[in-house]
UniProtKB/Swiss-Prot annotation:
Similarity section: Belongs to the argininosuccinate synthase family. Type 1 subfamily.
Source organism superkingdom: Bacteria
UniProt-annotated binding residues for ATP: 12-20, 39, 120
The protein, known as: Argininosuccinate synthase
Record keywords: Amino-acid biosynthesis, Arginine biosynthesis, ATP-binding, Cytoplasm, Ligase, Nucleotide-binding
Gene this chain is encoded by: argG
A GO term for molecular function: ATP binding
Pathway: Amino-acid biosynthesis; L-arginine biosynthesis; L-arginine from L-ornithine and carbamoyl phosphate: step 2/3
Binding, L-aspartate: 122, 126-127
InterPro entries: Arginosuc_syn_C, Arginosuc_syn_N, Arginosuc_synth, Arginosuc_synth_CS, Arginosuc_synth_type_1_subfam, AS_cat/multimer_dom_body, Rossmann-like_a/b/a_fold
Subunit composition and interactions: Homotetramer.
GO cellular component: cytoplasm
Naturally occurring in which organism (per UniProt): Nitrosospira multiformis (strain ATCC 25196 / NCIMB 11849 / C 71)
Record field: catalytic activity: L-citrulline + L-aspartate + ATP = 2-(N(omega)-L-arginino)succinate + AMP + diphosphate + H(+)
């Protein structure tokens, strides 16, 4: 990229060591104006210090946006309508946050007249792909600066040395480092690196931040009633809550009961296997409850088709294709399937488990007790009809068996 061509760049900025160094590096290397953007998506950290840090480094245009409601309403909830799991386990807490950050960066670039965007993702992981696919999908002619693919600052020590040489303020706690590389938002918190790079080693109990261990969870269960409207949870125990407030509350309740811990090895889009640990207490409750709600409101073939398509949908999100035409097409179908997913589900939280103990829909239940009963159904279901059903469905197998017997 021609350095002289860049006039203004929007940087996804946390205020931490990496993005603080990137900010200064952009100013010095590209001789361009830097606009900072800091998103509050429920990571649990104060975002205002990022404003002070940006001002110290000479930034004139600073954006700090509270995106928690938009994050849950427009990204998390649509994903959960599909019961989405990547490789059967991962609830995509990191993956689903990147499209929103990319979207807002592009919006700010348009508002400020910036001709480039930049991020702090390394050249080794998935996030670089997720961010940049989003940028190009939303603004095809945008320029992208990925410092980790350009500079020679390949270690924490080199970053700290650069910061010291260029007068970049770094808090002492940042210099000391942390045991794990962590990423958090309202849906989850993730842990990577250090001891976790050995997939044979169990993580220390002290690593987990959002949940107690199941062994230390309360000895008494807790019951929750969750109300669904068109596939989304709208109320908890009779109280209507906004999407972000509801997920935050479920995180608290789930964490209290040791729910939502995951330790897995996943296949990154860039080709390598990576071990990560995750805490997704609220999401784990949501997933279990949503499947229960669908169990009595979705037609069998619709439910099975959704289950067949879900791995592909999850893969699209994991790999960064949220803004792709195929994801949008699948979302339209998924959303249409949720029109009648209305009612309530009761779950029991107990020592790491989410146990569904009740579900009902006054308006959309396909469960007919008169037909399903083991008692006298008063003629609601004619059992003699099953003979013809079975015989026709066995026809192809009978033909094949007869052929084999003649050979």
């Amino acid at each position: 990229m021609n350095v002289a061509q860049i006039k203004k760049v929007v940087l996804a900025f946390s205020g931490g060591l990496d993005t603080s160094v990137i900010l200064k590096w952009l100013q010095d290397t590209y001789r361009c104006e830097v606009v900072t953007f800091t998103a509050d998506i429920g990571q649990g950290e104060e975002v205002e210090p990022a404003r002070a840090k940006a001002k110290q480094l000479g930034v004139r245009e600073i954006f700090i946006d509270d995106l928690r409601e938009e994050f849950v309403r427009d990204f998390v909830f649509p994903m959960f309508r599909a019961n989405t799991l990547y490789e059967g386990e991962y609830l995509l807490g990191t993956s689903i946050a990147r499209p929103l950050i990319a979207k807002r960066q592009i919006e700010i670039a348009r508002e400020t007249g910036a001709d480039a965007v930049s991020h702090g993702a390394t050249g080794k992981g998935n996030d670089q792909v997720r961010f940049e696919l989003g940028y190009y999908a939303l603004q095809p002619d945008i320029r992208v600066i990925a410092p980790w693919r350009e500079w020679d600052l390949t270690s924490r020590e080199k970053l700290l040395k650069y910061a010291e040489q260029h007068g970049i303020p770094v808090e002492m706690k940042k210099k000391e480092g942390s045991p794990y590389s962590m990423d958090a938002n309202l849906l989850h918190i993730s842990y990577e690196g250090r001891i976790l790079e050995d997939p044979a080693q169990e993580p220390e109990e002290s690593m987990w931040r959002w949940s107690v261990s199941p062994e230390k969870a309360p000895d008494s269960p807790e019951y929750l009633d969750l109300e669904f409207r068109q596939g989304d949870i709208v109320a908890l125990d009779g109280e209507e809550l906004s999407p972000a407030r509801l997920l935050a509350r479920l995180n608290e309740l789930g964490g209290k009961h040791g729910i939502g811990r995951l330790d897995l090895v996943e296949n990154r889009y860039v080709g390598m296997k990576s071990r990560g640990c995750y805490e997704t207490p609220g999401g784990t409750i949501m997933l279990r409850a949503h499947r229960a709600m669908e169990s009595i409101t979705l037609d069998r073939e619709v439910a099975h088709l959704k289950d067949e398509l879900m791995p592909r949908y999850a893969e699209l999100i994991y790999n960064g294709y949220w803004w792709s035409p195929e994801r949008r097409m699948m979302q339209t179908m998924i959303d249409a399937s949720q029109a009648h997913v209305n009612g309530w589900v009761r779950v029991k939280l107990y020592k790491g488990n989410v146990i569904v103990v009740g579900r009902d829909s006054k308006t959309d239940s396909l469960f007919d007790p008169h037909i399903a009963t083991f008692e006298d159904d008063q003629g609601a279901y004619n059992q003699m009809d099953a003979a013809g059903f079975i015989k026709l469905n066995a026809l192809r197998m009978r033909i094949a068996a007869n052929l084999r017997n003649r050979k």
